[in-house]
């Protein structure tokens, strides 16, 4: 039985889809000049990440969450092509490409982010990170949740070797 086709209930006008994404990167050496960028925000007192791109794990996790909804692989496909053919390392451009992969009848309605890392200190910049995410996704600030934990030394991230991010993203799809 096809539940959607055979249901006596009317077809809903909106379908909610949930995407999940993850990314992590190891820090470069302390002497690296590459900036540490998270959610498009620069953290001055930490080295950048080992990555072809700027290493923005927050924007990368969001890209992966969108990819889990659209089935279009951005990181490892589109982003690699942008890097190798045009030298583009800006993760906000990768995120723009992920957003473009949404159908015209799909809207991002909410995003939740959690970050784990012993460094940098996230709390002073959480507000700026929320604003940057809201702006990049063209959603209200109230639709962006973000938490961070130090990891208490329990993993490589908690020991300060890198940073990890998970993202849960809700997409509303109009079916009327």
Curated annotation (Swiss-Prot):
<keyword id="KW-0456">Lyase</keyword>
<dbReference type="GO" id="GO:0016114">
    <property type="term" value="P:terpenoid biosynthetic process"/>
</dbReference>
<protein>
    <recommendedName>
        <fullName>2-C-methyl-D-erythritol 2,4-cyclodiphosphate synthase</fullName>
        <ecNumber>4.6.1.12</ecNumber>
    </recommendedName>
</protein>
<comment type="function">
    <text>Involved in the biosynthesis of isopentenyl diphosphate (IPP) and dimethylallyl diphosphate (DMAPP), two major building blocks of isoprenoid compounds. Catalyzes the conversion of 4-diphosphocytidyl-2-C-methyl-D-erythritol 2-phosphate (CDP-ME2P) to 2-C-methyl-D-erythritol 2,4-cyclodiphosphate (ME-CPP) with a corresponding release of cytidine 5-monophosphate (CMP).</text>
</comment>
<feature type="binding site">
    <location>
        <position position="25"/>
    </location>
    <ligand>
        <name>a divalent metal cation</name>
    </ligand>
</feature>
<feature type="binding site">
    <location>
        <position position="60"/>
    </location>
    <ligand>
        <name>a divalent metal cation</name>
    </ligand>
</feature>
<feature type="binding site">
    <location>
        <position position="23"/>
    </location>
    <ligand>
        <name>a divalent metal cation</name>
    </ligand>
</feature>
<dbReference type="InterPro" id="IPR020555">
    <property type="entry name" value="MECDP_synthase_CS"/>
</dbReference>
<feature type="binding site">
    <location>
        <begin position="23"/>
        <end position="25"/>
    </location>
    <ligand>
        <name>4-CDP-2-C-methyl-D-erythritol 2-phosphate</name>
    </ligand>
</feature>
<dbReference type="InterPro" id="IPR036571">
    <property type="entry name" value="MECDP_synthase_sf"/>
</dbReference>
<dbReference type="Pfam" id="PF02542">
    <property type="entry name" value="YgbB"/>
</dbReference>
<keyword id="KW-0479">Metal-binding</keyword>
<comment type="subunit">
    <text>Homotrimer.</text>
</comment>
<dbReference type="InterPro" id="IPR003526">
    <property type="entry name" value="MECDP_synthase"/>
</dbReference>
<comment type="pathway">
    <text>Isoprenoid biosynthesis; isopentenyl diphosphate biosynthesis via DXP pathway; isopentenyl diphosphate from 1-deoxy-D-xylulose 5-phosphate: step 4/6.</text>
</comment>
<feature type="site" description="Transition state stabilizer">
    <location>
        <position position="52"/>
    </location>
</feature>
<dbReference type="GO" id="GO:0008685">
    <property type="term" value="F:2-C-methyl-D-erythritol 2,4-cyclodiphosphate synthase activity"/>
</dbReference>
<comment type="similarity">
    <text>Belongs to the IspF family.</text>
</comment>
<feature type="site" description="Transition state stabilizer">
    <location>
        <position position="150"/>
    </location>
</feature>
<dbReference type="GO" id="GO:0046872">
    <property type="term" value="F:metal ion binding"/>
</dbReference>
<keyword id="KW-0414">Isoprene biosynthesis</keyword>
<dbReference type="GO" id="GO:0019288">
    <property type="term" value="P:isopentenyl diphosphate biosynthetic process, methylerythritol 4-phosphate pathway"/>
</dbReference>
<feature type="binding site">
    <location>
        <begin position="149"/>
        <end position="152"/>
    </location>
    <ligand>
        <name>4-CDP-2-C-methyl-D-erythritol 2-phosphate</name>
    </ligand>
</feature>
């Amino acid at each position: 039985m096809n539940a959607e086709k055979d249901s006596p209930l009317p077809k809903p006008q909106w379908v909610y889809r949930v995407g999940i994404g993850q990314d992590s990167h190891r820090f470069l050496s302390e002497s690296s000049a590459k900036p540490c960028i998270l959610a498009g925000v620069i953290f001055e007192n930490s080295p950048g990440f080992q990555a072809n791109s700027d290493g923005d794990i927050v924007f990368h996790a969001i890209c992966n969450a969108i990819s889990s909804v659209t089935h279009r692989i951005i990181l490892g496909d589109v982003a690699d092509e942008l890097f190798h053919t045009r030298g583009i390392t800006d993760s906000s451009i990768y995120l723009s490409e992920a957003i473009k992969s949404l159908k015209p009848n799909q809207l991002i309605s909410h995003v939740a982010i959690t970050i784990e890392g012993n460094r940098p200190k996230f709390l002073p910049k959480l507000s700026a990170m929320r604003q940057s995410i809201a702006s990049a996704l063209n959603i209200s600030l109230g639709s962006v949740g973000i938490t961070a934990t130090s990891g208490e030394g329990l993993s490589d991230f908690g020991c300060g070797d890198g940073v990890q991010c998970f993202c849960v993203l809700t997409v509303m799809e109009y079916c009327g």
